[in-house]
Amino acid sequence: MARYFGELFMLDDDVHACKTLYAEKGESGRVKDKDKITRIILSLHEMASLMDIHLFGFTSRISPVMYNETSFLSLSKMITGCSYGIIYNKNTWWNEELRLKEDFWISCYMKYKERRVLTDLRYNFEQKNTFVNAGGLASIRNQEEERRSILFIKKNFGDSILLKSATNNGKDKTKQLVQYNITCKFKY
C-alpha cells in the first residue's frame, strides 16, 4: 500500500477520538472538529516531509500528566499503530511474517535504517479496546500470537528490544490480556 500510494496516513477504524495531551486541568482535551484533526495530521506530514523523515505518527500516551511541554516532538519515540503515516522510500518495509505488532516493527526498522521517526507527543488517537473487539485483527489477536510477534521482533533487533514489566499502561483490562510488552532502545 505504501509503495502504491507513496504518501499515506493510516487511521484505524476503531479510533473514536483525537485528544490533546496539553489540555489544562478542567479542559476537555477532545478534538471534535474534523477539519482541525485533518490539519493536525497534515501539519505533521509537512514537518516529516521537510525533515526528510519517512515514518511519522502520534503518541500512545493517554494522560496529560505524561506530557512534557518542552518536548512535544520526538525523533526517537515509537509511533502508535492506530495512527501513523508513511512517506515511501526504499527503507519503508514491513516483514510479512509478522501478523501483530507491525507498528512496532516499522518503528524499529526505520529507527535502525534511518535513525529517526517523527512522533508528535501533543496528540493521541484513542482506540476502543481492540484486544477483544470483533473484526480487524481480532480473529488472530491472542496472547500466543502477541508472544510470537514479540519474540520475532526481538530475534530481528536483538538487545535493542527490552521486555517491559507487567503494566496496565493506564488502560483498563490490558494487564490481564497482555502478559508482557516491549520497548526499544537502540544504542546510537
What are these regions (language model features)?
Residues M1-D12:
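Active-site nucleotide-sugar/metal-binding loop of Leloir-type enzymes
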Residues A2, S49, K111:
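Anion (oxyanion) recognition and catalysis
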Residues R3, S43-M47, F152:
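A generic secondary-structure signal
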Residues Y4-F5, I53, E114, F157:
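Short, well-ordered alpha-helix to beta-strand connector turns
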Residues F9, V15-W105, F186:
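Conserved catalytic core of nucleotide-sugar-dependent glycosyltransferases
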Residues L98-Y188:
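C-terminal catalytic/acceptor-binding lobe
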